[in-house]
């Protein structure tokens, strides 16, 4: 892997380094993805999720920056798996950038083939928001984790939160690092197992984690004390998830909730086998990859068997979309899929009404711009108290990484309202500079992923991948500033196709019209996708007469 010591920070303020705010937003968010406060391994262009990268190599990064700086307001830059390959004259309403990452003909869409092509410099794994330049640090998954636990509390315990409960989970990487804060935001306590001490320290630094220990006994003691005192606490435990889960099972200790958010989808880099440190695992992997993978599988199976034991003894368990069950099944565990997936269990009801992880980034770099938007949402969206509660919690407790940003689950209709409100605030001068508005690929109508977002669809359409392609094409012609289509995010190569977009609110009338189109179309196709699969809540929205038509409902 190429390694070059460079420290990247996004420009701040009102001064343009490019010929327009669309290009400027792409430049700043590409660089923000590689900020040391944001990225997992910026020296190697890795942003998060195993090997999810922002650009194929440093030469490609430099060429992207060069082209963004000279790109006209009626030109479009093409990115092929992290590498700029062309600039074409289009129109001012066309995307400034089109990104396609990691696409591979289905018959060849296997880990071995893909990573061989990647090693030869022919492709790049972009995860979801790494290669599409809209990663905002651990906050990017925070509300999804918060919403999952909140929905679990309502469904499983009949309560609005998890007060008095404790959660066992693992993984404090760029995605899993959201878990401890999401747990305490739901008024629960949690033990989060992590094998890498540096990741524990990073979550402490960013105020996502309250405390940590190397001792299971000490972690259990702290958990018990926090529950007795009614003081939600997140505890990082340095150790291996397979070892810890198995030991808790042997002791007969049954948590209220159990999950895992290691990067188990990546067998090479994402899951450290039992008995190894991060450093010794890397040495072992380099010396004997075949045996290393066998050990990884054995550890995943051991952890999964413990999770099933917890489930059978009363724990509420779920796979959090990291392909953990698939890896356990590949390792020989036939009943791995008795562990439910989190989307069909807890999140699909949100997706069905066009709700998902909406986000915005202050290109000024000033946190006050985000706080002003927070205040405006609290004032203007009183009809949605769940949204207001989240914004208040996030404003109080979320630490920014890189450019200040906010995420919230907003539904069809709300996204357009928020986008137009932000554009008005830029126009009026309430905000110091334009704002980039986007979302995760993990959303209502933008992904086909049978082990995660589209698992157990009502009509059996789990693997139908037309929808994310339609989503990307629709967003492009509606006026998104950049659009991306990726492969394999979250659940690994061969298991998902997904799309994303970003649109810039620069305060102009043109931006207003583009926002109206894009923020109607993007969640709207999610409503259609779920209505087409037979979800009543989606059908109900269409019957109310939204700003689109579905031919099968008059």
From Swiss-Prot:
Localization: Cytoplasm
Keywords for this protein: Cytoplasm, Histidine metabolism, Lyase, NAD
Annotated metabolic or biological route of this protein: Amino-acid degradation; L-histidine degradation into L-glutamate; N-formimidoyl-L-glutamate from L-histidine: step 2/3
Co-factor: note: Binds 1 NAD(+) per subunit.
BP-aspect Gene Ontology terms: L-histidine catabolic process to glutamate and formamide; L-histidine catabolic process to glutamate and formate
EC number, as in UniProt: 4.2.1.49
GO cellular component entries: cytoplasm
Highest taxon above the source species: Archaea
Annotated InterPro entries: Urocanase (IPR055351), Urocanase-like (IPR023637), Urocanase_C (IPR035401), Urocanase_central_sf (IPR038364), Urocanase_CS (IPR023636), Urocanase_N (IPR035400), Urocanase_Rossmann-like (IPR035085), Urocanase_sf (IPR036190)
Transmembrane segments: none
Reactions this protein catalyses: 4-imidazolone-5-propanoate = trans-urocanate + H2O
Keyword Hydrolase: no
UniProt xrefs under Pfam families: Urocanase, Urocanase_C, Urocanase_N
Catalytic residue positions: 408
Cofactor requirement: NAD(+)
Enzyme class: lyase
Physiological role: Catalyzes the conversion of urocanate to 4-imidazolone-5-propionate.
Homology family: Belongs to the urocanase family.
Descriptive protein name: Probable urocanate hydratase
């Amino acid at each position: 892997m190429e390694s070059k010591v460079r420290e990247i920070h996004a420009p701040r303020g009102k001064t343009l380094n490019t010929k327009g705010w669309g290009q400027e937003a792409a430049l700043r968010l590409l660089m923000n993805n590689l900020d040391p406060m944001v990225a997992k391994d910026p020296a190697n262009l890795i942003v998060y999720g195993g090997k999810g990268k922002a650009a194929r190599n440093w030469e490609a990064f430099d060429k992207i920056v060069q082209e963004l700086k000279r790109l006209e307001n009626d030109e479009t830059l093409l990115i092929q798996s992290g590498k700029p390959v062309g600039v074409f004259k289009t129109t001012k309403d066309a995307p400034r950038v089109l990104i396609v990452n990691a696409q591979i003909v289905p018959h060849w869409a296997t880990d071995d083939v893909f990573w061989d092509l990647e090693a030869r410099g022919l492709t790049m794994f972009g995860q979801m928001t790494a290669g599409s330049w809209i990663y905002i640090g651990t906050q990017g998954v925070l509300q999804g984790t918060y919403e999952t636990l909140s929905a679990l509390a309502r469904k499983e315990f009949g309560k609005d939160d998890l007060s008095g409960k404790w959660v066992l989970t693992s993984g404090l990487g760029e995605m899993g690092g959201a878990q401890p804060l999401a747990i305490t935001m739901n008024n629960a306590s949690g033990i989060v197992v992590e094998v890498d001490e540096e990741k524990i320290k990073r979550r402490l630094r960013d105020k996502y984690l309250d405390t940590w220990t190397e001792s299971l006994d000490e972690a259990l003691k702290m958990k018990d004390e926090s529950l007795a005192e009614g003081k939600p606490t997140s505890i990082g435990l340095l150790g291996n998830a397979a070892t810890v889960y198995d030991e808790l099972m042997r002791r007969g200790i049954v948590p209220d909730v159990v999950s895992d958010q290691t990067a188990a989808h990546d067998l090479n880099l994402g899951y450290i086998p039992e008995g190894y440190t991060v450093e010794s695992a890397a040495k072992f992997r380099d010396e004997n990859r075949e045996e290393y993978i066998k050990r990884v599988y054995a550890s995943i199976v051991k952890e999964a068997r413990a999770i099933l034991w917890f489930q059978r003894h009363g724990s509420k368990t779920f796979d959090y979309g990291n392909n953990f069950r698939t890896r356990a099944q590949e390792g020989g565990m036939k009943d791995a899929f008795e562990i439910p997936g989190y989307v069909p269990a807890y999140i699909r009801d949100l997706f069905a009404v066009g709700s998902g992880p909406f986000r915005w980034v202050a290109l000024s770099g000033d946190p006050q711009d985000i706080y002003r938007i927070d205040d405006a949402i609290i004032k203007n969206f009183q009809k949605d108290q769940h949204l207001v509660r989240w914004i208040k919690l996030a404003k109080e407790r979320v630490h920014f990484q890189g450019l200040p940003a906010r995420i919230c689950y907003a539904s069809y209709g709300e996204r357009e309202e928020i986008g137009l409100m932000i554009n008005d605030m830029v126009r009026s001068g309430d905000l110091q500079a334009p704002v980039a508005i986007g979302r995760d690929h993990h959303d209502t109508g933008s992904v086909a992923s049978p082990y995660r977002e589209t698992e157990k669809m009502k009509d059996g359409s789990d693997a139908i991948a037309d929808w994310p392609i339609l989503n990307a094409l629709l967003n492009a012609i509606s006026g998104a500033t950049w659009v991306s289509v990726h492969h394999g995010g979250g659940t690994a190569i061969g298991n998902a196709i997904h799309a994303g977009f970003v649109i810039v609110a620069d305060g102009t009338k043109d931006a207003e019209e583009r926002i109206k189109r894009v923020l109607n179309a993007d969640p709207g196709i999610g409503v259609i996708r779920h209505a087409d699969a037979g979800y009543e809540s989606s059908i109900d929205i269409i019957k109310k007469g939204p700003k689109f038509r579905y031919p099968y409902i008059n």
